[in-house]
């Protein structure tokens, strides 16, 4: 096992990365090694998909499958070895189909990269035996640590882009050009590139690709559900039977709401599903009563205390046996945990039956509401008033503080930072990092809330659109605005969001609570020199430096 993709990975003087029987996330060495086999097999499949495109053969099913299966290897997504083996076998089937179509066109495997010729084992044990040749750090003794770090930066960034591609696909947003670029990068990374400049360029290409994907996802969500609007959301429960929907998939939320009409079951969002409550479409369901809990890392306590059924529509899942709720949590799509019921289709009757059999909430809790819904359209509508207040000196600065949440004690930095920003500044937030401060009262500036919840992590697209609108209004570049980005990272979606911002030329971003363990000191120095990227220190010191600039 070798895995170094998330913020909680093991760090030692001897080297970084989880490399024992189990990773810090709970992923076993077996599952980790199988995921490496899957990734290499997918890189080979992408090579075949590229070759097919050269002959006018485009298979939209394969275009959808590769990023979806790649998504299964993200942090806290799929811990079920049998499911990973099934993805490998499906990838091989698709590859054989493409090879059969290309054979009459004289396209042979020996003309393609080595990954395209890789033959995965027929079963779990056979695939495990192949792990050394497919490990994500294969060839580590043949290249320096900077090359390996850049390979991993690109691989993990592309994982994040793959996740957003799958989220967009669920909303009927697919693009052949985006898929072709994804296959190109996926295939190239499978060749184990060893030159610094092409790898840096690849990282920027991934960032630009992801910007297009975020645009597709934004279009898919707003077409299906309308534009989010400022909305007050209840964050305390009400009496009644209940289902909790976590993850990111609003289509699953829609299906659950439809299938629970008239049942008396209340539906709650959790984690990154909170922004769904701001979409006009979901306001037609009175039994969507609010949001429960906070960010992913608290689920073992929060799910244990939730007296109903839980559905994980995407990341993040952690061991449900710790809180003894594995019999009432259900997984969907790419999510998996051994022994947990997985729902293959769109029938949620098993979830409904479980909710009806459970106690539900018995008591009324004091009402507590928070305001959400400041995504792209709402921000654009508010922009003229914001611009006027900037010109009048009523708003001095904009802070975007958000990203991933996590367990590390140092993440208290984000709460402290949010509390400490000047009263004449606006605080934008997105991702589950918002839970560090989104239940605090920040007041308003002339009727404009100081805390503006932009949405899910992918709604960084909305924040970028606001920055572009402000730069146009003030006739300056984005980097000349009184705008500071302070991001928290945990996994690969955050990595690709960062690559997107860097590829768009955004500078002087601060990230924390730690630097990714796969980035060497030399690579971090390059990122600081080229982009002004800095690590967080203390809220007081960082804020003083920002305001003095």
Swiss-Prot record:
GO molecular function, one term: hydroxylamine reductase activity
Keyword Metal-binding applies: yes
Metal-binding listed as a keyword: yes
Database matches in InterPro entries: HCP/CODH, Hydroxylam_reduct, Prismane-like_a/b-sand, Prismane-like_sf, Prismane_a-bundle
Cell compartments where the protein resides: Cytoplasm
Binding site for hybrid [4Fe-2O-2S] cluster: 248, 272, 316, 404, 432, 457, 491, 493
Cofactor(s) this protein cannot do without: [2Fe-2S] cluster; hybrid [4Fe-2O-2S] cluster
Pfam families tied to this protein: Prismane
Keywords tagged on the record: 2Fe-2S, Cytoplasm, Iron, Iron-sulfur, Metal-binding, Oxidoreductase
Predominant place of localization: cytoplasm
GO biological process: response to hydrogen peroxide
CC annotations in GO: cytoplasm
Residues at which [2Fe-2S] cluster binds: 3, 6, 18, 25
EC number: 1.7.99.1
Modified residues (Cysteine persulfide): 404
Catalytic reaction list: A + NH4(+) + H2O = hydroxylamine + AH2 + H(+)
Cofactor details (free text): Binds 1 [2Fe-2S] cluster. Binds 1 hybrid [4Fe-2O-2S] cluster.
Function summary: Catalyzes the reduction of hydroxylamine to form NH(3) and H(2)O.
Record NCBIfam families: hybrid_clust, PRK05290.1
Family: Belongs to the HCP family.
Name this polypeptide is given: Hydroxylamine reductase
Taxonomic source organism: Aeromonas hydrophila subsp. hydrophila (strain ATCC 7966 / DSM 30187 / BCRC 13018 / CCUG 14551 / JCM 1027 / KCTC 2358 / NCIMB 9240 / NCTC 8049)
Protein's gene: hcp
């Amino acid at each position: 096992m070798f895995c170094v993709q998330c913020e909680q990975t093991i760090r030692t003087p001897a080297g970084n990365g989880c490399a024992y029987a189990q990773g810090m996330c709970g992923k076993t060495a077996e599952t980790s090694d199988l995921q490496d086999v899957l990734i290499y097999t997918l890189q080979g499949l992408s090579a075949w998909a590229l070759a097919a495109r050269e002959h006018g053969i485009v298979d939209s099913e394969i275009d959808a499958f590769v990023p979806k299966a790649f998504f299964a290897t993200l942090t806290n997504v799929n811990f079920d070895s049998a499911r990973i083996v099934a993805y490998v076998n499906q990838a091989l089937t698709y590859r054989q189909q493409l090879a059969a179509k290309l054979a009459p066109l004289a396209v042979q495997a020996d003309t393609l990269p080595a990954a395209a010729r890789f033959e995965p084992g027929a079963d779990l044990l056979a695939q495990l035996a192949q792990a050394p040749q497919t490990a994500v750090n294969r060839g580590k003794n043949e290249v320096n640590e900077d090359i390996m770090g850049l390979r991993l930066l690109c691989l993990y960034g592309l994982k994040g882009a793959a996740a957003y591609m799958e989220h967009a696909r669920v909303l009927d947003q697919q693009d052949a050009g985006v898929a072709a670029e994804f296959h190109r990068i996926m295939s190239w990374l499978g060749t184990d590139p060893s030159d610094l400049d092409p790898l840096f360029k690849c990282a920027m290409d991934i960032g630009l690709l992801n910007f297009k994907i975020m645009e597709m996802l934004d279009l898919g969500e707003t077409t299906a559900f309308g534009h989010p609007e400022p909305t007050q959301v209840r964050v305390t429960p009400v009496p009644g039977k209940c289902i909790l929907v976590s993850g990111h998939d609003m289509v699953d939320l829609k299906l659950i709401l439809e299938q629970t009409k008239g049942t008396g079951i209340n539906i709650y969002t959790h984690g990154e599903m909170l922004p769904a409550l701001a979409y006009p479409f979901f306001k037609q369901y009175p039994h969507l009563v609010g949001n429960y809990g906070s960010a992913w890392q608290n689920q073992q306590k929060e799910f244990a205390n939730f007296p109903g059924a839980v559905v994980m529509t995407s990341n993040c899942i952690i061991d449900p046996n710790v809180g003894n709720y594995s019999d009432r949590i259900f997984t969907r799509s790419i999510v998996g945990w051994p022994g947990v019921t997985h729902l293959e289709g769109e029938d949620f009757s098993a979830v409904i039956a479980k909710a009806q059999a459970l106690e539900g909430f018995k008591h009324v809790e004091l009402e507590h509401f928070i305001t959400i819904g400041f995504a792209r359209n709402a921000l654009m509508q508010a922009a003229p008033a914001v611009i006027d207040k900037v010109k009048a000196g009523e708003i001095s600065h904009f802070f975007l503080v958000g990203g991933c949440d996590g367990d590390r004690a140092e993440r208290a930095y984000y709460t402290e930072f949010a509390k400490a920003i000047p009263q004449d500044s606006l605080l934008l937030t997105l991702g589950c990092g918002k839970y560090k401060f989104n239940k605090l009262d920040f007041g308003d500036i002339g009727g404009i809330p100081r805390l503006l919840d932009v949405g899910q992590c992918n709604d960084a697209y909305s924040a970028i659109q606001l920055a572009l609108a402000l730069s146009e209004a003030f006739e300056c570049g984005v980097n000349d605005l009184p705008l500071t980005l302070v991001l928290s990272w945990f996994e690969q979606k955050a990595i690709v969001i960062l690559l997107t911002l860097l590829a768009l030329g955004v500078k002087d971003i601060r990230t924390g609570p730690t630097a990714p363990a796969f980035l060497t000191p030399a690579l971090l120095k390059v990122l600081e020199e080229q982009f002004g990227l800095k690590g967080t220190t203390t809220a007081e010191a960082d804020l003083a430096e920002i305001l003095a600039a």
